[in-house]
Amino acid sequence: MKGILRMGLVAVAALAAACAPRERTLVLLSTNDMHAKIQNFPRLASAVEACRDTAQLVVLVDAGDRWTGNAYVDMAPTPGMPMIALMNELGFDVATLGNHEFDHGQAFLGRMIDSMDFEVVCANVVSDTCTFPQLPPYTVIDRDGIRIGFVGVVTNYEGPGHPAGNESSFAGLEFPDPQAMALKYAAELRPECDVLVLVSHMGDDRDAELLAKGQSQYDVVIGGHTHEEVDTLIGGTLLTQTGKDLRNIGVTTVRMKGHKVAGVDYRIVPLADYEPDILYQKQVEAYYADPGLNKPVGRFGNAADKWGLANWMAAAVADEADADVGFYHIGGVRLDSIPAGGVSAAKVYGLEPFGTLVARMEMTPAQMRRMIVSKYNDPVNAKEAHRIDLISTTPYVIVTDAADNALDVQFPKLREGRKYKVAVSDYIYRNYKDMEYTGGEITVEKVADILLEELRDDSPLKIDNTPRQRVVRK
């Protein structure tokens, strides 16, 4: 009798095990802020292919800013197309928009979206123009019966009211609050999905702010915009970001028990750990075979760091406009350094990839002070606040209180009350708050062209890496 009972218990246990939900693993591979760095794409291809060889359920995701940052992509016959062609071939599944997707205008972006073989989702862009398609707010991907929902959002904080960029790029488009849209579509999509992912180009600070509200129903946030390496858990949601420039790939492992999420893990994997895929390497080399971009146009007599490059650009806009003072925003300096020796056109376009124009006006020291203090204390763009953002040809000192709020700006070489001729980038002119001036205008002179001309005419250039601006606490 006992033997029969034991056999019955074993049979019941076996039946229970057979009926238990099957455990499976879903892998989300993610990139963000690739900024046209196709030189690293062959290593990305190797990493993705290695994962697909070992994992059955894989989704490849990008969180925006696919171009702007590499002349071989940005100045291709169709700007941006080398990156999109490589992404199509590798088989990206879904992406959202970044602010730099709009750099060439919305009509161009609309045409580029038609060239993308992957789904582009964005819940907080509303189009009222025929030049730009109305994008879906989300998509649902099925992997072996597991339904994964992806909601996309893009920043609207820097515009204000739209992503950072020229106002003309956003005519006819509205950008509702990305956090509100993320919450709205999470509530709508959650009942339909086993896994819910927010693909965000708001920045990790805004992502964390959203999750801290405690209303999120997302399992994972795949983030971008702020170029940070992020791996943190907030309110049960995993918040991730891989940095920038295809230096890393994000690997999110979602353990599923039946149709329930049993656990989520994340790793940032350096792509330097992978050998380049040979076929992708050949394609990239073909894109780089451009003698017009490769040939040095001049020389640096010494290595330039980021401060030195910013000093050079501020001086260049001032010289071109015959101004007394030049300002350049540090966010527009897109390289961290350039070594001594030959400097190619590609390097200059990598330093200044936006087609930035020179703007000129007249300002008093009081008006310059107001501009600098406003930017330093910026309550909206927290990542750009409380740092020296405006590099200038004239020295100045920002005086702060104990809480690091700017109180004053001292100009040792300027005379109070006098009007000075001032030159800035058109990005500053169009977008910075509390700008007061007289006689302002945007010229047709491009910053990159000015830098190239200087290299051709005055090489070797000696770059001054000495910071002219500093912050002191009162």
Predicted regions and their residues:
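C-terminal motif of bacterial Sec signal peptides marking the signal peptidase cleavage site
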Residues: 15-18
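N-terminal leader/targeting segments
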Residues: 10-12, 202
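Catalytic centers of hydrolytic enzymes
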Residues: 24, 31, 37, 169-171, ...
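Sec-dependent signal peptide recognition
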Residues: 2-10
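Acidic, metal/ion-coordinating pockets
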Residues: 20-275, 305-316, 326, 362, ...
